[in-house]
Design a protein with these regions (language model features):
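N-terminal Rossmann NAD(P)H-binding glycine-rich loop of SDR-like oxidoreductase domains
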Residues: 17-37
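Conserved Rossmann-fold cofactor-binding substructure of NAD(P)-dependent oxidoreductases
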Residues: 74-92, 96-102
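ADP-ribose/adenylate-binding Rossmann-like module
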Residues: 99, 110-128
Length: 285
């Protein structure tokens, strides 16, 4: 409450770290850290890993290798002062701490106070809508970017459809993408399965208030653009549910296990680019 009144006037050029990965020792956090450790260019960025356990963080750092070892910072999602301390030292906090509907907002608030950009890999569309409704104006006033849904939910779908739409527009007929179907084949390696954070997120959503979830979804879908309005999103979600035959993939398909996230996100991103209304089905073999 009143968070915009407490935003600190600190320029991001003064920050000690370009990126802090919060929740670095979880499944998703480790993947992000491995990427950062091995993809540094000629001018490596200074970055840090953050979490509750110093021992686990140090073990992670020693396993990474690479030319730019991250620093270790301690913070707890339930300790607001520790979150503010790491936010003040970073240009961007990348949070891999979920479920976000239970653990995400304190770090978002810390980033707003410290004028620090935020990114996450949540698939909790209802939570993203809630955060936008609660903190969107304060973030815009502070020049802070809050970027969600940056992982498997829903980057592959968004990029694939962006490339398809661009190819159609550049083609001889200058066509527009109006109908699309994504078909995913999941290959789970032996001993593999869903990350613990994903399972906790699903369980948290199942135990949440249905009205609260609906309000969050509605807030996310809120747009003056027809493509991102609630009815086209619901139509695409219903179209993803049924068992059907895909002539393009040559197989029967069911709803993708993340269709409830990917469909509204794709509609939102298409609407933001001024695209025509889209009928999109998210399916898997």
């Amino acid at each position: 409450e009143g968070i915009s009144r407490h935003i600190r006037r600190m320029t991001r050029d003064d920050r000690e770290f370009s990126i802090v990965v919060f929740g670095a020792t979880g499944d998703a956090g480790r993947a992000v850290c491995r990427y950062l450790a091995t993809k540094q260019g000629a001018r490596p960025v200074k970055w840090a890993v953050a979490g509750r356990s110093k021992a686990k963080l140090e073990t992670l750092v020693s396993s990474l290798g690479g030319s730019s070892a991250p620093s270790v910072l301690l913070a707890d999602a339930c300790d607001a002062s520790s979150l503010l301390r790491i936010a003040e030292r970073a240009t961007l906090v990348f949070s891999a701490v979920g479920p976000y509907s239970r653990l995400g907002e304190p770090m978002v608030k810390a980033c707003l106070v410290a004028r620090t950009h935020w990114a996450d890999i949540t698939g909790e569309v209802f939570w993203v809508g809630e955060m936008e409704a609660k903190h969107g104006e304060a973030a815009a006033a502070a020049g802070v970017t809050l970027t969600s849904l940056c992982g498997y939910d829903s980057v592959p779908c968004e990029l694939s459809l962006h490339v398809a739409r661009k190819a159609l527009k550049l083609g001889a007929r200058h066509s527009e993408l109006l109908d699309a179907e994504a078909v995913t084949q999941l290959n789970v390696p032996e001993g593999g399965g869903a990350p613990a954070g994903t399972l906790l997120t699903v369980l948290t959503a199942l135990g949440s208030n249905a009205l609260g979830l609906a309000k969050g979804y509605a807030a996310f879908a809120r747009s003056n653009d027809e493509s991102a309005a609630l009815w086209p999103v619901l139509r695409s979600m219903l179209g993803s549910l049924s068992l059907g035959w895909s002539p393009q993939a040559g197989c029967f398909t069911l709803a993708h296990f993340m269709f409830w996230c990917n469909v509204p996100v794709v509609h939102r991103s298409f609407g933001a680019r001024g695209a025509n209304p889209l009928r999109f089905r998210d399916r898997e073999q």
